[in-house]
């Protein structure tokens, strides 16, 4: 059975990420972001959202593990910042129901959502510049880089919250990540 850990970066929806994976039949565990990287035994990692970069614990070190990583909201931002991209204040801050345009139908994480999907966004900062090796896979009117992927390294990020009920195809994002982690 595929095992995916959800790293708690103190976000308000982290428990919903764990529940979404559990409901898909994934062997999942919610772990504290102070867990040493060498103690992680998993086929994949979800870096949860959270309030700010000052409370991300060992999350940057998890990017060095040789397993797929999905960053959600702050998780995507810390991935971009740690791997050489740039994060800054967004033009739109707060909560929003957003229509996201999928730019890469072949992307293993979100390509199946093409041509567009409705999502729930809740962020003040966003990725402004992609790290080397990443492609922008989704965009919207309120956020230029809504999703990014580096399929060579199995690193994926979404700025929105697929775990929230207001996101219309959120479960599909988790299904796709489960399949990536299982090698399907």
Swiss-Prot record:
- Identify the residues that the record assigns to the Glutamine amidotransferase type-1 domain, covering every copy: 3-184
The cellular component terms of Gene Ontology attached to this UniProt record, alphabetical and capped at eight, are: cytosol
Provide the active-site residues from the annotation: 73, 161, 163
Which EC number applies? 6.3.5.2
Q: In which pathway does it act?
A: Purine metabolism; GMP biosynthesis; GMP from XMP (L-Gln route): step 1/1
According to UniProt, the reaction catalysed is: XMP + L-glutamine + ATP + H2O = GMP + L-glutamate + AMP + diphosphate + 2 H(+)
Which InterPro entries would you find in this protein's record?
Answer: Class_I_gatase-like, GATASE, GMP_synth_GATase, GMP_synthase_A
Q: Keywords in UniProt for this one?
A: ATP-binding, Glutamine amidotransferase, GMP biosynthesis, Ligase, Nucleotide-binding, Purine biosynthesis
- Tell me which CDD domains the record gives: GATase1_GMP_Synthase
Which molecular-function annotation in GO is an example for this chain? Answer: ATP binding
Q: Which HAMAP family match?
A: GMP_synthase_A
State the function annotated in the UniProt record.
Answer: Catalyzes the synthesis of GMP from XMP.
| PANTHER family registered for this protein in UniProt | GMP SYNTHASE [GLUTAMINE-HYDROLYZING], GMP SYNTHASE-RELATED
Q: What NCBIfam families has UniProt attached to this entry? A: guaA_Nterm, PRK00758.1
Q: Could you describe the subunit structure of this protein?
A: Heterodimer composed of a glutamine amidotransferase subunit (A) and a GMP-binding subunit (B).
Protein's name in the database: GMP synthase [glutamine-hydrolyzing] subunit A
Gene behind the chain: guaAA
């Amino acid at each position: 059975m595929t095992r995916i850990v959800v790293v708690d970066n103190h976000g308000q929806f982290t428990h919903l990420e764990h529940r979404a994976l559990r409901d898909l039949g994934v062997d999942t565990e919610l772990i504290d972001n102070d867990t040493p990287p060498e103690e992680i035994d998993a086929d994949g990692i979800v870096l949860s959202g959270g309030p700010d970069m000052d409370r991300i614990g060992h999350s940057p070190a998890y990017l060095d593990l040789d397993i797929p990583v999905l960053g959600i909201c702050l998780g995507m931002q810390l991935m971009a910042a740690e791997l050489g991209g740039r994060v800054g204040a967004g033009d739109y801050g707060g909560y929003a129901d957003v229509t996201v345009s999928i730019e890469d139908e072949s992307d293993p994480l979100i390509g199946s959502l093409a041509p567009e999907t409705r999502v729930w966004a809740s962020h003040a900062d966003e990725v402004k510049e992609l790290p080397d090796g990443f492609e922008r896979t989704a965009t919207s009117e309120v956020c230029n880089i809504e999703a990014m992927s580096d399929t060579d390294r199995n690193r994926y990020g979404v700025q929105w919250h697929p775990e929230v009920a207001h996101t219309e195809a959120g479960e599909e994002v988790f299904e796709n990540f489960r399949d990536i982690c299982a090698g399907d």
